[in-house]
Amino acid sequence: MNDYIVVKCGGSMLDQLNDVFFDCIKKLQQQYKVVIVHGGGPEIDAKLKDCNINVEKRDGLRVTPKEVMDVVQMVLCGSTNKKFVMNLQKHNLLAVGCSGCDGKLLQVQPVSEEIGYVGEVSYVETALLKGLINMNYIPVIAPIGIHDNEIYNINADTAAAGIAAALSAKELILITDVDGILHEGKLVKKTDESEIATFIEKGVITGGMIPKVQAALASLKMGVQKISIVNGTKDFTEDTGECIGTTVTRGVSIV
């Protein structure tokens, strides 16, 4: 059990997770060393609305001036992270919640001044993750990072990909509410970069699946070898640890 697996769970999925999801995490833990990264978009947007702070997005990234970053930090590192940790522990999964600024876990480079406190992962302090795992804890990471002693928001997909690449993880698992990529009503079990481009061009991949596959492609570019898009509301893990869904690699596809 030397291989790492990184599981990314978007904020919109956190309230949909059922017993099946936690059973799948237990199965993964029997085969791999597990790290979880979570988002929190819906809860952040709701809190910003409560605070009467307008939200602007550019190219899918939330524009994050200081007052927005304060709310992002409060939600991601506070309520969202701790609720997820408590839910894992309710299902007998020992977990430790932390953010990318704890122990300088996630160091970032700012994306641009125009979008404020938004960063991309430049360095991962893997020793912290490995230490927690060696003590039989699952690290549960809120995707914020640091740069020059300032806190930055990180897209959860790219945070998970950065962590997976730094750990040389066997796989990055993207938890969604769909079974994977469907083609003519059938699940595409394996695909690659070129086939995904064809699927998008032909309209096979549309709507909410497009950002999911774009996240998978971005992860490949960051050095992750394999990404699986799975349905977190169903049993997505074989007893062997293999995922049930769509697996994206750089190699030749087998549909």
Curated annotation (Swiss-Prot):
- Protein's recorded name: Acetylglutamate kinase
What is the organism of origin for this protein? Bacillus thuringiensis subsp. konkukian (strain 97-27)
One Gene Ontology BP term is: L-arginine biosynthetic process
Q: Where is this site: Transition state stabilizer?
A: K8, K212
UniProt cross-references to PANTHER family, sorted A to Z: N-ACETYLGLUTAMATE SYNTHASE (PTHR23342), N-ACETYLGLUTAMATE SYNTHASE, MITOCHONDRIAL (PTHR23342:SF0)
User: Which Gene3D superfamilies does this entry report, sorted A to Z?
Assistant: Acetylglutamate kinase-like
What Pfam family does this protein match (any one)? AA_kinase
The catalytic activity of this protein is classed by the Enzyme Commission as 2.7.2.8
Superkingdom, natural source: Bacteria
Keywords, in A-Z order: Amino-acid biosynthesis, Arginine biosynthesis, ATP-binding, Cytoplasm, Kinase, Nucleotide-binding, Transferase
Chief location of this protein?
cytoplasm
Please tell me where substrate binds in this chain: G40, G41, R62, N153
What does the record give as its pathway? Amino-acid biosynthesis; L-arginine biosynthesis; N(2)-acetyl-L-ornithine from L-glutamate: step 2/4
The record's similarity note reads:
Belongs to the acetylglutamate kinase family. ArgB subfamily.
* GO CC, any one term: cytoplasm
Where would you find this protein in the cell? Cytoplasm
GO terms assigned for molecular function: acetylglutamate kinase activity; ATP binding
The residue ranges crossing the membrane are none
Name the lineage.
Answer: Bacteria, Bacillati, Bacillota, Bacilli, Bacillales
Show the catalytic activity: N-acetyl-L-glutamate + ATP = N-acetyl-L-glutamyl 5-phosphate + ADP
- Physiological role: Catalyzes the ATP-dependent phosphorylation of N-acetyl-L-glutamate.
> Which InterPro entries does UniProt cross-reference here?
AceGlu_kinase-like_sf (IPR036393), AcgluKinase_fam (IPR004662), ArgB (IPR037528), Asp/Glu/Uridylate_kinase (IPR001048)
